[in-house]
């Protein structure tokens, strides 16, 4: 394990599963043996307020907040959040956005899980770890649908 800190910024609107997705990434990174820090910012979701979550992991992480210009990844559950978060992105940052997915996924309640699948193309955590976390986070009938969406997004089918 090198000294690199990986910075993932999640952004969207209240109710879109931003916190659920960032919680799952936090747990996955922890189970992979990383030191993990997480922060959340909750807007007024009843009025379409922004919600964001910073997840930072590496050998040793001291602050939960991603400094401006250091986000490696942006997981934006709404397209308009990309401009809002731009100052946090490092040059060459990977942006995962709804338009990366077919309409039936982009407009579903499983978009956050699909985005984790797409993110895992870069993180390369074991799929079985993600499937276990999905099963722990959702009821059985919902979990299997989420696993299918995760798998498709991770394997470039969605």
Show which residues each predicted segment covers.
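Active-site cofactor/cluster-binding pocket
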Residues: 1-158
């Amino acid at each position: 394990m090198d000294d690199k800190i990986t910075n993932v910024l999640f952004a969207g609107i209240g109710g879109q599963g931003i916190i659920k997705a960032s919680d799952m990434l936090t747990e996955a990174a922890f189970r992979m043996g990383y030191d993990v820090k997480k922060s959340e910012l909750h807007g007024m979701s009843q009025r379409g307020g922004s919600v964001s979550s910073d997840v930072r992991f590496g050998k040793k992480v001291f602050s939960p907040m991603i400094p401006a210009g250091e986000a490696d990844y942006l997981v934006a559950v709404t397209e308009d959040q990309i401009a809002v978060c731009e100052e946090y992105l490092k040059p060459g940052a990977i942006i995962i956005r709804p338009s990366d997915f077919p309409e039936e996924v982009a407009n579903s309640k499983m978009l956050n899980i699909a985005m984790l699948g797409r993110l895992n193309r870069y993180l390369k955590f074991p799929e079985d770890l993600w499937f276990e976390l999905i099963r722990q986070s959702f009821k059985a009938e919902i979990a299997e649908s989420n696993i299918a969406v995760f798998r498709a997004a991770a394997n470039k089918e969605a």
